[in-house]
Structure formats: structure tokens, C-alpha cells
Amino acid sequence: GGLAMEDVLNPRHGNPRIATELAGAALIARGVDVRTIRLPQVHDTTRAGLITPLAAQARRAGAVAYLGEGSTRWSAAHVSDVAKLYVLALEQGEPGARYHASGEEGVTARSVAEAIGKGTGLPVRSITAEAVDHYFGWMAPFAGLDMGASNAWTRARLGWEPTGPDLLTDLAAMDYSRLEGA
């Protein structure tokens, strides 16, 4: 799929966040000032969104897996950049606007898996669609989603400039032995 854009609200999209966006749209229709921040994989060297439980699952399974060629993407942003965006959205944002907190438009699943593999010392492998539910468990619905997101509009409207470390840098510095569930 293509990059998610801030000006698009697709009520049939498979991303679970659609429920909060629809609730926000209903409030906007009633005159409430709502500003939506679409969060990516928010990370630092201690946690990384859905990647943290993915790393814990890899330790339990004895291998790090990604679906198919690993070409699906997850947008990402350092926690300090996301915090700055919340402030900008409150101070300068427009009622009803949606903003993407994407410091990076999309990091491939394979790159993430390889970083986890290097950090944990576990082998990295591709799995088939048939094995996704078994390996990923509750995270299976996310394994095949291409969740890249553009931040061009957000940057232009709010002057937001992400400056924090990128996802792969934080994953390289993460202490995987300290992860919850590891």
C-alpha cells in the first residue's frame, strides 16, 4: 500500500485506530475541538511500540520472524519528537485536523526483525501467511499491514522537525534482556 496521508480518513481501513478516529469525527460533528495525532511506533532505547512485544515473542519462540519478504513498513518516531508534536498541535493546530507523528515514513519489517535478531542473538527468518497466527499471536493482524505514513503535511502546517534518533538506532542500543516478557 501507499503512505497514509493526514487528510484521508477511511472508515473501512483495517488499522484498529479507526475506532478512535470515528469517535473523534462524531465529536467534531457536535462542535468539539478535536485534533488527532496518529501515532507510529513510538520508540526510545527502552520501548518501541508494538516492536517491544514482538521482541519478547521472538525470545519465547527462539527466532525473530517477519512475513514473506518483510517489505511491509511501519512508520516510527522518537518519543521526544512525538512529545514536541503534541505541544505544537495544541498550540498551533487546527480543529478537526489529523497529524502524523512519523519521524520516519516507513521502516521495513525485515529491517526491524534483523535489528531485533542482532540485539538478541536470535536467528531471523521469513514465515508464510499460514504461520502468522501461530507465531505472532495477538499481533498477527499487524504483521501484514503496510503502515507507512507521510509527515509532509504535518511538518508544513506545524513546523515540526523530528530530530531524535531513528528506530533502527534505538533498536541497536536497546537492552533486550530487560524487556517485559523477555
Task: Indicate residue ranges for each PLM-predicted region.
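Active-site "gating" loop of Rossmann-like NAD(P)-dependent oxidoreductase/epimerase domains
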Residues: G1-N15, L22, A29-R30
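Glycine/proline-rich active-site loop of Rossmann-fold NAD(P)-dependent oxidoreductases
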Residues: I18, H43-L54, L88-Y99
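Conserved beta-loop-beta element that borders a ligand/cofactor-binding pocket
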Residues: L22-T45
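A conserved pocket-lining segment of Rossmann-fold NAD(P)-dependent short-chain dehydrogenase/reductase
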Residues: A56-A77, D81, L85
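Amphipathic alpha-helical segments that line or abut small-molecule/effector binding pockets
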Residues: S80-L88, E114, L168, A172
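Mid/C-terminal beta-alpha module of Rossmann-like enzyme folds, strongest
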Residues: L85-M139, L179-A182
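Conserved C-terminal active-site "lid" loop/helix of NAD(P)H-dependent oxidoreductases
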Residues: R110, E114, D133-E161, S177
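Amphipathic terminal alpha-helices
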Residues: P165-A182
